[in-house]
UniProtKB/Swiss-Prot annotation:
Protein name: Homeobox protein Hox-B3a
Biased composition (Polar residues): 116-125, 205-215, 449-464
Cellular compartment(s): Nucleus
Gene: hoxb3a
Motif Antp-type hexapeptide: chain residues: 168-173
UniProt entry keywords in alphabetical sequence: Developmental protein, DNA-binding, Homeobox, Nucleus, Transcription, Transcription regulation
Function per UniProt: Sequence-specific transcription factor which is part of a developmental regulatory system that provides cells with specific positional identities on the anterior-posterior axis.
SUPFAM superfamilies assigned: Homeodomain-like
Biased composition (Pro residues): 439-448
GO annotation, biological process: anterior/posterior pattern specification; embryonic skeletal system morphogenesis
Amino acid sequence: MQKTTYYDNSSTLFGGYSSYQVQGAAAAAANGFGGYDAPVPVSHHQPAFQSATHLDVDSYQRSACSLQSLGSTNSHQQQQQLAKTKELNGSCMRSSLPPEHHPSSQVSPPLPPNPTNGNSGAQQPGGSAGTSSKSGSNKSSTSSSSISSSTSSSSSSLPPNPTLAKQIFPWMKECRQTTKQKTCSPSNNSGNGAESGSSGEKSPTGGSSASSKRARTAYTSAQLVELEKEFHFNRYLCRPRRVEMANLLNLSERQIKIWFQNRRMKYKKDQKSKGLSSSSGGPSPTGSPPLTMQSSASYLNSMHPMGGGGGYDVPSPPSFGKPHQGVSYAMSTAYSNVPVKGCPPQQKYGPPDPDYGDPHPHHSLVQANSAGYGTPTNMQGSPVYVGGGSYLEPMPGSGPSMYGLNHLGPTPTHHQTMDYNGAGPMSATNQHHVGGGGPPGPCDPPTHPTYTELSAHHTSSQGRIQEAPKLTHL
């Protein structure tokens, strides 16, 4: 590649509506690629000026858009015909340049390569038209090659002339933008022009993909009311209903799906905070024990698995108004093989009683008639199995509670009642055991197991579930 001299003729640059002229030798034209010189713009309204250039034959043979191989004359003739039919606009310029930058059909002819004619002054428009009619093929070949070489120079950004790097023409900027659009059109906002703009406006969810942060969707109050109503009836939305709501509320399916996801998370959070507050504030009014109690009961259940699958129903809460003097529990005579300390191994127990889980008061939570439910101390323990029946829930005001499983012998009695010995309000220091404490041994079948007061050494249990030995021995 050899350097060429370049003379800028600045008086002919008019606002970008210009065609570019490249002088090339006859050999370079036969080669299919004209010699590259700096383009000199020629306006529509002015006589065509030509830059006085002298150029060697074989300079800058490179094309970005043309698909011809070097030195093929057949493809060069095809390119001539293509350039003629497209009125010298250039097949590659049409795809890359906007229409206002396309060169017009009035192209000044190339000069013969001798330097004397190359140094001639201004050429008249009439003369330019005459010579353009004479040298049609030469002109078309050089114009198309000038277009291709100009695009190649801008895209490859390797100009042969150092002065060309300093001057940036509007077509260079435009072509750089178009190559940028081609390579990264999905991520470029200004890339596809109206297409990406309209798609950004059409899609209400995220705007165009060039914006890294999605715009926050603002729901109207009417939309929120409808969404909340739907969430109240159904927390999980099926697809047909989602499509219906999207059409109804003028939202996209994706927005409705994401709204429901967020609403479910909020609902879970609310439930969790409600559960924590109710567990700290006494028995929960909904009938299911608080979350901490449930987890403790399941922990106890895993330590001492009951027969019949280990699952249990949550008993209905006792009516707070009437205290039961003798709350009878359904103590089934059949237990699972819970290892009990000091008991003979012939105590084999079967599945629990069939009427377990009945929300009758004798299955309900244990109530002390004297310990009022308004006592300020919180319920610190957790519900436990008593026998094969339902929960034993700790008394409010009983402090850290201890539980023991009722040890029934292999007696065929179907139900046994537990009476409360009518002690006063249970103090926080005294512990109360379910089961046959007192004079009979732990394995003797107590016919009427009474609540017996224990010594104060059991008060160290911090409201948590007791270890297995403390649970079973009395």
